[in-house]
């Protein structure tokens, strides 16, 4: 059953398509093909370097360290779409994240989320999970199961290493 609780939504019964159709460019210009991650859980977060939620990079890295042995794929998607809070180049974003948070999870290049130039992944999120799931700000989070289906989303205020999220990741890993 679909359920709406605060800033998250359980959408297992609504989602029909999987994420394996989508590609991103990495912060280093290489291809990130989600099809390469079939059979693994995926956690996607839209990010920004100058946001009040930027501290969540540390929480995301904590997830990376905790779950990398279980195959969790984490992808951060820097964007300047919300409050112009991203740095001016991919190189600056990479340096910022390395120096300040020592991240080891994947980052895409700076990516459009909103509007006509918005990445197809986010259009898919809106189609599959509804308007509320579409990012309204930085640090929206999307949890995808081993079949490539979007099963949960979380708004900016939900910390990546919260019990809400880690409990769901644990469930997916055990499937």
In which residue ranges do the predicted regions lie?
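Proline/glycine-enriched tight loop/beta-turn segments at coil->beta junctions
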Residues: 37-41
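Thiol-/selenol-based redox modules, centered on thioredoxin-like
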Residues: 120-123, 127-175
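N-terminal "domain-start" segment that seeds a small globular fold
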Residues: 12-35, 55
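Single conserved hydrophobic/aromatic residue that forms the stacking wall/gate
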Residues: 1-11
